[in-house]
């Protein structure tokens, strides 16, 4: 493709390479390093004048360092006269801080949106935003892609009894997500209502729906410490589910997450590769990965060629 340059930040180079391979491109030359005082240094190693630039950087790992690196890369390309800079952020950082849920709380997702715009981003491509209203925090175009088509494909190909499954949301907020998947599979859905006492602590869970003698598939956009989904798995099995799977777009898996998954009764915990999972998979055989590089690659190709991206909301590109 002419007039396109693809750069990778240091957060998820494996995903960036997969996207580049699918597009038939070489990743652009960029050197990122830290000065002795821990400031981030970025050197763009090739001309981007008049080019359509895409920078792939996920909000994972050392999140603050990676966000700063992305902002500097965007700005470096912008002031080097690139025609357009698109930030491809598979897992959007600070997405859970999207509203004032208590007094004096910051809306950090809005701050990140402002920072990206000020740095010089012209367009954002992301996946399964924790809250879809984050798109409205930007004054530039945002394409929020969905992992749902890839999730549906995985369910049909890997769960033999999928026609006898029930899609379960671990909280009321994910009801829209699970009803969409349940409708596409033509199966029923259930949800678990949880009463939280404080962050990362779940108090009481109430199951709404009948899971007896069915394969329960928990679906959520992200899992961090995995307390919620592991409690939910126990709840579903005690309510008569034959097997429990969990399918998540963003597998953050921090703190006690891996030991909780190992001790829980999941058949599999399936995540996409918006966040690197290689190290986690070494310590947990239940984790399986859906590759979404083809969705990102096709979104980049369509954006570059001025084509519609909405086809990707319901189809997995070949």
UniProtKB/Swiss-Prot annotation:
Cofactor(s) of this protein: Mg(2+)
SUPFAM superfamilies linked to this entry: PRTase-like
One example of a Gene Ontology biological process annotation: purine nucleotide biosynthetic process
InterPro entries according to UniProt: PRib_PP_synth_CS, Pribosyltran_N, PRibTrfase_dom, PRTase-like, Rib-P_diPkinase, Rib-P_diPkinase_bac
Region feature (Binding of phosphoribosylpyrophosphate): 212-227
Keywords tagged on the record: ATP-binding, Kinase, Magnesium, Metal-binding, Nucleotide biosynthesis, Nucleotide-binding, Transferase
Pfam families for the chain: Pribosyl_synth (PF14572), Pribosyltran_N (PF13793)
Chain residues that bind ATP: 96-101, 130
Catalytic activity: D-ribose 5-phosphate + ATP = 5-phospho-alpha-D-ribose 1-diphosphate + AMP + H(+)
Activity regulation, per record: Activated by magnesium and inorganic phosphate. Competitively or non-competitively inhibited by ADP, 2,3-bisphosphoglyceride or GDP.
Keyword presence, Plastid: no
EC number: 2.7.6.1
Record keyword Metal-binding present: yes
Superkingdom, natural source: Eukaryota
Residue spans crossing the bilayer: none
Gene Ontology molecular function: ATP binding; identical protein binding; kinase activity; magnesium ion binding; protein homodimerization activity; ribose phosphate diphosphokinase activity
Residues binding Mg(2+), per UniProt: 128, 130, 139, 143
GO cellular component: cytoplasm; cytosol
Annotated metabolic or biological route of this protein: Metabolic intermediate biosynthesis; 5-phospho-alpha-D-ribose 1-diphosphate biosynthesis; 5-phospho-alpha-D-ribose 1-diphosphate from D-ribose 5-phosphate (route I): step 1/1
Family, as annotated: Belongs to the ribose-phosphate pyrophosphokinase family.
Function according to Swiss-Prot or TrEMBL: Catalyzes the synthesis of phosphoribosylpyrophosphate (PRPP) that is essential for nucleotide synthesis.
Complex and partners: Homodimer. The active form is probably a hexamer composed of 3 homodimers.
Name assigned to this protein: Ribose-phosphate pyrophosphokinase 2
Source organism: Homo sapiens
């Amino acid at each position: 493709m002419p007039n396109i340059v693809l750069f990778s930040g240091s957060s998820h180079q494996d995903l960036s390479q997969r996207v580049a391979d699918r597009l038939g491109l070489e990743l652009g030359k960029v050197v990122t390093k830290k000065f002795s005082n821990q400031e981030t240094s970025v050197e763009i190693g090739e001309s981007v004048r008049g080019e359509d630039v895409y920078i792939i950087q996920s909000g994972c790992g050392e999140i603050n360092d990676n966000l700063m690196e992305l902002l500097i890369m965007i700005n470096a390309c912008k002031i080097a006269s690139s025609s357009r800079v698109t930030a491809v952020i598979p897992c959007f950082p600070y997405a859970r801080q999207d509203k004032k849920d208590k007094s004096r709380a910051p809306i950090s997702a809005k701050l990140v949106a402002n920072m990206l715009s000020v740095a010089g981003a012209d367009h954002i491509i992301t996946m399964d935003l924790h809250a879809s209203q984050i798109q409205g925090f930007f004054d530039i175009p945002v394409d929020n892609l969905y992992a749902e088509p890839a999730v549906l494909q995985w369910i049909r190909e890997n769960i033999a009894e999928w026609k006898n499954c029930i899609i379960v949301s671990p909280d009321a907020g994910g009801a829209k997500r699970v009803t969409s998947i349940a409708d596409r599979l033509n199966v029923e859905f259930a949800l678990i209502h949880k009463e939280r006492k404080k962050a990362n602590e779940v108090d009481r869970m109430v199951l709404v729906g009948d899971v007896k003698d069915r394969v329960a598939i928990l679906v959520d956009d992200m899992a961090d410490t995995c307390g919620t989904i592991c409690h939910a798995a126990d709840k579903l099995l005690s309510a008569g589910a034959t097997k429990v799977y969990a399918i998540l777009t963003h597998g953050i898996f921090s703190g006690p997450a891996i030991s909780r998954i190992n001790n829980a009764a999941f058949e599999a915990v399936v995540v996409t590769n918006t966040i690197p999972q290689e190290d986690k998979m070494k310590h947990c055989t239940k984790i399986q990965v859906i590759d979404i590089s083809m969705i990102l690659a096709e979104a980049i190709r369509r954006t570059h060629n001025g084509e519609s991206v909405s086809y990707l909301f319901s189809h997995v590109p070949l």
